[in-house]
Amino acid sequence: MSSRQNQQSSSQHSSSSQQGGQGGQGVQGSSSYSRTEVHTSSGGPTIGGAQRTVPVPPGSHSEVHEEREVIKHGTKTESETHVVTVPVTTFGSTNMESVRTGFTVTQDKNLTVAAPNIAAPIHSNLDLNLGGGARAEITAGTTVDLSKIQRKDLGPEEYARYKAKVEQLARQDEQDAGMRAAQYREEVERDAELIRQILERQHIRDLEFRKEMVENQVNRQEREIQLEAEYAMRALELERNAAKEALESAKAQTNVNVKVESAIGTTVSKGAIQTSADKSSTTKTGPTTVTQIKHTEQHTERR
């Protein structure tokens, strides 16, 4: 029953509005007119309609504007001295260039704002059983019926002014909502650009960190190779000194026998050669070093 009454009240509202409009146009100059009555279907009127689509004015980032910026940042390497056979000092620098491109764009969409609705009427029903076959029913409720007010106070002209004021309020609200949406969009675009720039700087820092780690590993391997070469040279020097000392302290002996048969007879020549070495050296800590070497003595025996 309530839905059927609501449909009937809605049809009465539309028919009465049409009759009021036709009466106002057909009887211009006369004193009689048809009163417009508005019956609400939900017990309370709605202000400004159910929903409104608010247009947002375009901003500075409504189109794609690509930015291009060349960032040059170089690093200087410390001077290093590598002793191979001749001291060599190398000075170097690395120039690294990053090309940053980017843009910020906002795809605008219509802002849909729901209009407030006046609360539905409140009804309460209390059924009391008093005993002895007696009963009492109490009904209480609150409602706002705009049609009663219009029957008493509003004519067609006043209702038209009321509708014009409602539309003006709606347009002003749409304009204010569009300006607030544009301001919020600018804040979002500014924050998005800031986040993008922070991530771009992080990209450059990541490259520099990777380069630094690789250089540290190369330097460590170079120091390991130098240390290994140093110990290899030390071992080779020890072997060379041991071989030299063995040669210097070695002893050798050779026996020589010569026998010649000739027409005049037999000639025999015998001999022996013995070689020995004894090295002695004295080292003093100071500006000079004195080394004494005992030369090899050779003995030859002839028989």
Swiss-Prot record:
Residues 170-257 form a coiled coil. Residues 1-67, 270-303 are annotated as: Disordered. Residues 184-202 are annotated as: CAHS motif 1. Residues 294-303 have a biased composition (Basic and acidic residues). It is found in: Cytoplasm. Keywords: Coiled coil, Cytoplasm, Repeat, Stress response. Residues 221-239 are annotated as: CAHS motif 2. Residues 270-280 have a biased composition (Polar residues). GO terms for cellular component: cytoplasm. It comes from the Eukaryota. Residues 1-19, 282-291 have a biased composition (Low complexity). Signal peptide: none annotated. Its main location: cytoplasm. CAHS proteins contain 2 repeats of 19-mer peptides designated as CAHS-motifs that comprise each two octapeptides connected by a tripeptide. CAHS proteins are cytosolic heat soluble proteins that seem to contribute to the anhydrobiosis in tardigrades, but their specific mechanisms are yet to be identified. It is possible that protection during anhydrobiosis might occur via the stabilization of vitrifying small molecules such as sugars, but not via the direct glass transition of CAHS proteins themselves. Belongs to the Cytosolic-abundant heat soluble protein (CAHS) family. This is Cytosolic-abundant heat soluble protein 3. It comes from Ramazzottius varieornatus.
